[in-house]
Amino acid sequence: IRPYIVVLKSNVNKKQLNEFEEKYLRNRNSVLCLMDNIADLEASLKLSSIYLELNPQNHFYSLDILNALAMGNAVVSWENDVNRELLPKEYHNYLTGNGDIKRLIQTLTNLLKMNAQERNFTGRTSRNYVLNNFNIKNMEELLIDAYSTLSFRKAS
C-alpha cells in the first residue's frame, strides 16, 4: 500500500484531521501520514497517492498541485476557479467548499476506500491530464501557431 500524505499549510483543521488519521490507523485499513513540513516534496509525492492542499487563499496556479497530479496523486483541495481548472473534470468532486471539514473528511474517506485498481486509474488520469494540458511543448506549439497566423495576416 502506498501511504497517503496530507500536507498541512496551516494548523486550522489539524485537530479534526488528526482524529481522522487515528480512526484509519486504529482500523489498519490504510496509512495516512499528516505532515506539517516536507523537506523534499517530490520524494514524498513519489511515495504517496493522495495530496491534500488546504490553502484557502489559492488564487494562483499551484505548482505543488500540478506536481502532485503529474506524480499520479489524487488531489483534494478547496473549490475555487483555479483549482477547477487544474484538476480533471472527472475529479472535481475532490474539491470541497472552503472550511467544509465534514465534506473534506467524506472525500478523504471515499478515496481511502478505493481499491488499488481504481487508485491507479485515478493516478494515471491525473498524470495524463497534466502532461496533455500543462506541457511546455504544447504551449509552445500554440504560441507559434498564433504568431504565424498573425504574421501571415500582416503580410497579406
Identify the meaning behind each predicted range.
Residues 2-17:
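Glycosyltransferase donor-sugar binding loop
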Residues 17-37:
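Nucleotide-activated donor-binding/catalytic signature segment of Leloir-type glycosyltransferases, i.e.
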Residues 37-48, 70:
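Short acidic alpha-helix that forms the nucleotide-activated donor recognition element
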Residues 42, 63-70, 84-85:
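Short alpha-helical segment that forms part of, or immediately flanks, the ligand-binding pocket
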Residues 46-60, 73:
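Acidic donor-binding loop of glycosyltransferase active sites
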Residues 56, 73, 77-84, 98-99:
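Short glycine-rich donor-binding/catalytic loop of glycosyltransferases
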Residues 89, 93-101, 111-116:
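Conserved acidic donor-binding segment of nucleotide-sugar-dependent glycosyltransferases
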Residues 116-148:
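A charged, aromatic-enriched C-terminal amphipathic alpha-helix characteristic of glycosyltransferases
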